[in-house]
Amino acid sequence: MARKTPIERYRNIGISAHIDAGKTTTTERILFYTGVNHKIGEVHDGAATMDWMEQEQERGITITSAATTAFWKGMGGNYPEHRINIIDTPGHVDFTIEVERSMRVLDGACMVYCAVGGVQPQSETVWRQANKYKVPRLAFVNKMDRTGANFFKVYDQLRLRLKANPVPVVVPIGAEEGFKGVVDLIKMKAIIWDEASQGTKFDYVDIPAELVDTCNEWREKMVEAAAESNEDLMNKYLEAGELSEAEIVKGLRDRTIACEIQPMLCGTAFKNKGVQRMLDAVIDFLPSPVDIPPVTGELENGEKTERRASDDEKFSALAFKIMTDPFVGQLIFFRVYSGVVNSGDTLLNATKDKKERLGRILQMHANQREEIKEVRAGDIAAAVGLKEATTGDTLCDPAHPIVLERMIFPEPVISQAVEPKTKADQEKMGLALNRLAQEDPSFRVQTDEESGQTIISGMGELHLEILVDRMKREFGVEATVGKPQVAYRETIRKSAADVEGKFVKQSGGRGQYGHAVITLERSELGKGYEFVDAIKGGVIPREYIPSVDKGIQETLKSGVLAGFPVVDVKVTLTFGSYHDVDSNENAFRMAGSMAFKEAMRRADPVLLEPMMAVEVETPEDFMGNVMGDLSGRRGIIQGMDDMVGGGKIVRAEVPLSEMFGYSTSLRSLTQGRATYTMEFKHYAEAPKNVAEAIISAKTK
C-alpha cells in the first residue's frame, strides 16, 4: 500500500495546558473543523470526544492521553491535505507522568493558556517537560471572550514566568464580550468568523482603524524575529525593511523548530473563533517527523545509532501508553519512528527481548476506532494482541534489533493500604491493580509483608483516588482505602569503610561459608543504588559477586532506622574470602546483606521525607493567613508573584506529611477563594524531632 499522506505533511502534536484553560474544548474544535466530528462535544455537558473515561467526564478534567488522527487543508482550503495526529495530554499536576510520556512521542506542542488566568503553576511544569524533550511549540491564548481577558498580559507572563520567547502572529480584535476575531499579522488582514456556521466560514476584512498602529508595531517585531533565522533574510530585511509572506513563514518556522521562539495566537474555542487559524499555524510552524533530529537508540553490541523517519529504514517504534478497552482488551499505543509494519507481522520487543505477533492495528479517533492494515514512519496507532509490551518499550524488526532511549518515570511519593470489601472482590482486586499498574508506570502495587495488606503508591491523593475509582467502575471491585501514608526513605550521612559480613555455618556435613567486605558511601541525590566490584586476585570467585549484590539489594528494601527503603548509596565490594566446599550463592547473599546492615548502622543513617512544591493562588487579603499556615506546616516560602487580574501566588516547599487535608483548611482560611497545586520536588532530610516520632511510631 502506498502512503496516503507524504511524511512531510504529518504533524504529531500535543495539546497541553493546565486545568480550565479550555484544552479539551480546543481539541474538540480541532476535531470539528477538521471534519471528523460533526457535532461539537462540550465539556460543560461532560460529552467531549477526547475525554473518554467516565471519571474524566464527571470531573471535567482530562486524565488519559488519547491519540486521534485528523486531516486539515487550511481554513481557506489553501494547503495540500495535512495529517495531524493529536495526543491529548492531561492538565492536572498528579498526571504529570502522562504529560511526560506524551512529550516523548510528540514532534510539536500547542500550549493553551487562559486569557484571564495566564500562566499557571501547571503550565510551568509542562513547559519544563517540553524543554527537556526539546519540543517546538506554539502558544494559544484561549477564552478571549471571558471577563478580564488580556492577550498582552499573557505575553508578558510567558516571557517572565516561563522565560519563553513568544512572537504574536495575530492580534486580538477586542476582548471580553467585545472579542470579534483576530488580525493576521502575516497577511495584515482582519479575520472575522461567521457565527451561524460555527466558525467554519470566515471573511478577510480591513484592519479596524483603531488597531492599525498596534498591528504595525507587532508586525515589525514578528518580521524581525523571522529575519533573525538566517543571514540572507536579515540582510534582505535590513536593506528592504520588509520580507515576503513566504519568507516570514519560513523564518518563523525555522526558529520555532529550533526552539528559539514560540508563535503566539489567540481565540475562544467555546465561541468558535481562532482555533481555525491556530490549525494553520500548526501546519506553518510545527515540524513534520523529518524536520526533527532522527531518533537515537542502542544496538545489541551497545553501539549508539540513529533511525531516520523514513519508510525505507528498518522498523522501530516506541510503546508509549497502554489502555484497557472494554471491547478489544488491551490496547498498546505506539509511535512509529522508522520503517513500515503490517498487521500479522512478528515484532521484537527489544526492551524485554521477546518476540510477539502484531495482531490488529487500530487508528484511534478519541473513542472510536478504525482498523488499518499497516503503519509507516511518523504514524501513531494502537496495537491489539501484544501481551508483553509495557510503557516505554521499543518494538522493532526482529532482524535489526534496536533499543530506543527509555522514558524515566518518577518514584511514587504517597501510599495507601487498600482492602477488598468481600472475598469475591479479593481475586478481582489483584487482577485490576496489576492491569492498572501496567497502564501507569508511576503507580505501584506491593504487599506489606508484616501486615499482609496490599499497598498502592502513586504521585498524589487525586492520582490514587482516580485509580481506586477506576477499579470500581471498570473491574467492579469494591475496596476500602486506608489513610494516605508518606513514602519515607533512608540514606546515610557518612561513609563506612571495610565493613565485613560473614555467614558461616559448619556443623558437620556440607556447611555454608560467605565472607564479604564492603565500603558504603553516600551518592548524589536521586542517584539510587550503585554497586562497584573492586575485588582483586579472585578472593571472591566471579560467580558469587552477583549474589553479594543481590543480598544488598534485598536489604535495601528495608533500612535500619524504621524499615523504609534505602536510597542514594554506593557500595564497593573490596575484599572477602571463600571456602572450596562450603561456599555457595546463598551464603554470599547472606554475607552481603549482613555487611550492608552493619555498614548502614555505622554510617550515621538518616530519614528522608518527600518535599512538595506548593503554589497557592490567593486574594491579597488572605495572604498573611496563607503564609502563616504554610510556615506552620514546616513550609519554606520560596517567593511570591502577582497574579493577572489581582491576587498573589505564594510558592513554598512543604513536607508532604504536613499537606494532608490541606484543601479543607485552605478553604476555611480564605473563605473558599484560594486554590493550590502541589507536585513532588525532591527528598530532604527530616528534622530530628520529626524523624524520631516517625521511627518510634513505626518500630512500636
UniProtKB/Swiss-Prot annotation:
It is found in: Cytoplasm. Gene3D superfamilies: 3.30.230.10, 3.30.70.240, Elongation Factor G (Translational Gtpase), domain 3 (3.30.70.870), P-loop containing nucleotide triphosphate hydrolases (3.40.50.300), Translation factors (2.40.30.10). GO terms for cellular component: cytoplasm. This is Elongation factor G 1. InterPro entries: EFG_II (IPR041095), EFG_III (IPR009022), EFG_III/V (IPR035647), EFG_IV (IPR047872), EFG_V (IPR035649), EFG_V-like (IPR000640), EFTu-like_2 (IPR004161), G_TR_CS (IPR031157). Keywords: Cytoplasm, Elongation factor, GTP-binding, Nucleotide-binding, Protein biosynthesis. The keyword Methyltransferase does not apply. GTP binds at residues 17-24, 88-92, 142-145. Residues 8-290 form the tr-type G domain. SMART domains: EFG_C (SM00838), EFG_IV (SM00889). Catalyzes the GTP-dependent ribosomal translocation step during translation elongation. During this step, the ribosome changes from the pre-translocational (PRE) to the post-translocational (POST) state as the newly formed A-site-bound peptidyl-tRNA and P-site-bound deacylated tRNA move to the P and E sites, respectively. Catalyzes the coordinated movement of the two tRNA molecules, the mRNA and conformational changes in the ribosome. Pfam families: EFG_C (PF00679), EFG_III (PF14492), EFG_IV (PF03764), GTP_EFTU (PF00009), GTP_EFTU_D2 (PF03144). The keyword Cell cycle does not apply. GO terms for molecular function: GTP binding; GTPase activity; guanosine tetraphosphate binding; translation elongation factor activity. It comes from the Bacteria. Its main location: cytoplasm. Belongs to the TRAFAC class translation factor GTPase superfamily. Classic translation factor GTPase family. EF-G/EF-2 subfamily.
